[in-house]
């Protein structure tokens, strides 16, 4: 989709015309399969490296267009958020030192990006979800200023006719309504591509589904969103809900989310997979660059199947089927979309090597996996891995097994054999599979981040802890040590962080509030139980309407505790915005001689600064 000028499908005529070309693309693909035109070998690999742009104090930067212009390299492109960019690697033949060559290529490109970013007071970071993200960064003003992103945002919003409802429950809980698809921009991935022989495509696709849970478990690197500890790989939950075009869970024409693992094992041919997608998910976009693929094929040329690729670009399976043309030859690929970016480039390449090795190493025991494993087990394994990472218990071939045992005893040996049989350099196999093996025995990205985050909070605020985490990851992302060798942080501070602390960064977040209708007796006991002296008062709209203090209760006396909060609260309040500086907050408190300063945003009570 990124290469096409797209527009939203609106009129019945536009939809009919686009569908006409879409059906022709399917027929052309069938014809190419029948005539054995799809390339079978050599096999190629490739990757899409998404990364974040951060300011000098490690907050999201809005300078993607400026940085992209300075980079001036065709390998780079935009993402939906202004604080993200993407690198598309060159395709490489699957042989010898291809993985270390990819490592070097991405290292050079990321170094180029870092240098260009620095000229705009910006840094680059590879991580699954940027720890310093705040709610304001997912507003529409952070959408990258390119027409296709506004068109996609509009199309997805129109297909829902209501706000996106995000609810994720982990150790903490996140629940919010959002009016755009910008939550998608929270996710940063390392998407890996493997060319597949068309004769074995469906069986290979089902195998890719079967191994998704275990591969994800060892790769998890995104446990935090807006400071909350959610899933080991929170990207899975965020992306599933942020692109969901269903208005609720009961929809007749789309029982799956556009972001999904699937509903069953695939059967038939690769064209049947595309047919299923088209049957389930209505087209959202069209382009003026349509072509009659059958006519092109009849001329002896190879069509690009533009209509099909455009539709496929709005269906986000975690294992996505891809069609492409390279060197005048059509080919099929599986795109693995669930692997996160980071925490180091070496970790990312190791993740890819593990996945490719497993895909290549599929033994006779696992051929036709659809007849040997229940699909619900594969799907359940995937989402359990997203929640719990390496702490997952998998159901593998009808047996329960720990993630560690499954990796060390079964999957790592399969992957090594697959790589050896493909002629991959022995040193590369030892290096990258050694990283996976060491990570299984120690820590992966999400485990390191959670342990470090908890340790840092013993001395620092949640905001400072997230900032220091981000600073450390930036400093070490291209180092020789992979995450399995990182020490968990307990006290870390970079002197080059240029902090301009605001109220949002230091305000108390774990607060008790009372309603106007609550009794003063309840308020009195809450204050005694929790040893607090101030309680914000809110109405049913969550708007701050008053403040009740222990001094107020003393003045009233016990006889009046039967009355409501509304009858006794202070209503002439001094408040502050969460975006104001800490110096301003301190100044206000000193001037008015107060010990509690409520923080509000658009009349809604947020928290309190003491």
Which residues does each PLM region occupy?
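Bateman (tandem CBS) regulatory domains
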Residues: 498-511, 562-573
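Phosphate/nucleotide-binding catalytic core
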Residues: 1-497
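The conserved cystathionine-beta-synthase
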Residues: 513-531, 538-539, 557, 575-595, ...
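Short beta-to-alpha loop/turn elements within the nucleotide-binding domains of ABC transporters
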Residues: 501, 518, 548, 563, ...
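Histidine- and aromatic-rich ligand-binding microenvironments
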Residues: 552-553, 567-568, 581
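Glycine-rich, positively charged N-terminal anion/phosphate-binding segment
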Residues: 490-500, 550-561
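Short hydrophobic beta-strand motif reused across regulatory alpha/beta modules
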Residues: 545-553, 595, 608-610
């Amino acid at each position: 989709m990124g290469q096409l000028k797209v527009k939203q499908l609106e009129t019945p005529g536009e939809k009919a015309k686009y569908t006409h070309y879409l059906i022709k693309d399917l027929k052309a693909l069938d014809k190419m399969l029948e005539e054995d035109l799809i390339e079978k070998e050599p096999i190629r690999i490739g990757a899409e490296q998404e990364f974040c742009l951060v300011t000098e104090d490690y907050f999201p930067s809005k300078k993607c267009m400026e940085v992209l212009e300075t980079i001036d390299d065709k390998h780079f492109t935009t993402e939906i958020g202004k604080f993200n960019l993407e690198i598309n690697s060159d395709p490489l033949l699957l042989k010898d030192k291809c993985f270390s060559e990819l490592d070097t290529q991405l290292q050079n490109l990321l170094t180029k990006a870092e240098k260009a970013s620095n000229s705009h007071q910006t840094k680059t970071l590879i991580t699954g979800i940027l720890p310093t993200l705040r709610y304001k960064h997912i507003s529409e003003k952070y959408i990258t200023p390119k027409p296709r992103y506004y068109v996609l945002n509009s199309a997805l919003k129109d297909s829902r006719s209501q706000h996106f409802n995000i609810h994720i429950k982990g150790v903490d809980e996140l629940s919010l309504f959002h009016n755009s698809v910008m939550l998608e921009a929270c996710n940063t991935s390392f998407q890996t591509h493997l060319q597949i022989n068309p004769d074995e495509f469906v069986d290979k696709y089902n195998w890719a589904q079967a191994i998704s849970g275990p591969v994800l478990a060892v790769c998890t690197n995104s446990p935090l969103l807006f400071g909350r500890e959610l899933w080991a790989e929170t990207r899975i939950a965020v992306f599933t809900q942020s692109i969901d075009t269903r208005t609720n869970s009961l929809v007749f024409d789309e029982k799956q989310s556009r972001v999904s693992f699937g509903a069953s094992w695939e059967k038939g041919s690769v064209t049947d997979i595309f047919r299923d997608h088209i049957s389930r998910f209505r087209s959202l976009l069209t382009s003026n660059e349509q072509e009659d693929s059958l006519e092109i094929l009849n001329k002896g040329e190879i069509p690009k199947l533009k209509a099909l690729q455009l539709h496929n670009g709005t269906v986000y399976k975690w294992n996505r089927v891809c069609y492409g043309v390279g060197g005048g030859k059509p080919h099929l690929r599986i795109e693995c979309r669930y692997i996160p970016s980071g925490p180091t480039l070496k970790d990312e390449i190791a993740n890819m090597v593990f996945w490719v090795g497993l895909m290549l190493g599929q033994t006779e025991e696992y051929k036709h996996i659809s007849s040997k494993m229940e699909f619900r087990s594969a799907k359940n394994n995937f989402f359990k891995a997203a929640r719990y990472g390496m702490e997952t218990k998998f159901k593998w071939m009808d047996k329960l097994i720990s993630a560690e045992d499954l990796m060390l005893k079964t999957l790592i040996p399969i992957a090594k054999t697959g790589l050896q049989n493909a002629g991959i350099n022995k040193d590369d196999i030892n290096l990258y599979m050694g990283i996976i093996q060491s990570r299984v025995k120690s820590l992966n990205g999400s485990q390191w981040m959670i342990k470090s985050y908890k340790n840092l909070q013993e001395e620092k605020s949640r905001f400072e802890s997230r900032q220091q985490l981000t600073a450390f990851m930036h400093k070490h992302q291209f180092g020789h040590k992979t995450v399995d060798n990182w020490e968990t942080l307990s006290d870390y501070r970079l002197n080059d962080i240029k902090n301009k602390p605001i109220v949002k960064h230091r305000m108390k977040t774990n607060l008790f509030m009372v309603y106007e209708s609550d009794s003063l007796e309840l308020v009195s006991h809450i204050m005694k139980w929790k040893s607090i002296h101030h309680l914000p008062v809110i109405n049913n709209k969550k708007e701050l309407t008053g403040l009740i203090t222990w001094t107020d209760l003393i003045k009233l006396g016990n006889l009046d505790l039967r009355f409501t909060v509304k009858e006794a609260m202070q209503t002439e309040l001094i408040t502050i915005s969460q975006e104001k500086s800490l110096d301003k907050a301190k100044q206000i408190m000193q001037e008015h001689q107060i010990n509690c300063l409520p923080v509000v945003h658009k009349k809604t009570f947020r928290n309190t600064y003491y």
